[in-house]
């Protein structure tokens, strides 16, 4: 499912090439609106901002409540997505992180939960992923070292520019 026709056409080609045309149906849909509650066991919501991921789950709550699991890969606002999930009846049961073409992508498998898990996560765990931290995920460690290096470079520039205006262009170049 996708809200745009182009990605559906490309997905249909991949499905056909994989010989899965009978098992996979394509639908043009805004979020989960073209699904009925109980129609599917799982969804993948990936390749979009965290705000949109949260909106899809909120607007499609009737469907989301009947899912056995969701695979999520938000590309921004990761901590907000984790907090939203934990406050809205989901438990994060698995986390992964990959590096592709210089960009870090966290992913999570979530399942419905009867109780709020929010109080079990501190701010660091929300930001970087409790399960990723617990497993000392090698890609997370690489990401943290990169962040440390970028922040050190910014601090060094600030030290050298004492009395000069701060270059916001330089700071923006280091945003993730």
What are these regions (language model features)?
Residues 144-151, 155-158, 172:
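Amphipathic alpha-helical coiled-coil segments
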Residues 52-59:
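A short, conserved alpha-helix within the catalytic core of class I
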Residues 4-5:
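Conserved SAM/SAH-binding beta-strand->alpha-helix loop
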Residues 63-106:
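C-terminal substrate-binding/active-site "lid" region of AdoMet-derived donor-dependent transferases
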Residues 96-149:
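Substrate-binding/catalytic lobe of Class I Rossmann-like enzymes that use SAM or dcSAM, i.e.
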Residues 169-176:
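Conserved small/polar residues in nucleotide/adenosyl-binding loops
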Residues 40-46:
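Short SAM/SAH-binding signature in class I
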Residues 9-36:
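S-adenosyl-L-methionine
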């Amino acid at each position: 499912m996708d809200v745009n026709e182009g990605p559906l056409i490309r997905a249909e080609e991949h499905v056909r090439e994989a010989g899965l045309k009978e098992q996979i149906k394509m639908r043009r849909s805004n979020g989960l609106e073209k699904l009925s509650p109980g129609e599917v066991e799982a969804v993948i919501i990936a390749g979009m901002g965290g705000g949109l991921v949260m909106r899809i789950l909120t607007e499609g709550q009737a469907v989301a409540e009947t899912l056995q699991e969701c695979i999520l890969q938000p590309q921004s606002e990761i901590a907000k997505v984790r907090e939203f999930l934990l406050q809205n009846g989901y438990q994060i049961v698995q986390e992964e992180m990959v590096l592709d073409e210089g960009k870090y992508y966290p992913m999570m498998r979530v399942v419905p939960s009867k109780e709020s898990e929010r109080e079990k996560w501190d701010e660091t765990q929300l930001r970087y992923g409790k399960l990723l931290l617990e497993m000392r995920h090698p890609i997370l460690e690489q990401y943290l070292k990169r962040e440390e290096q970028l922040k050190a470079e910014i601090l060094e520039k600030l030290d050298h520019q004492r009395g000069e205006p701060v270059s916001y262009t330089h700071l923006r170049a280091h945003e993730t």
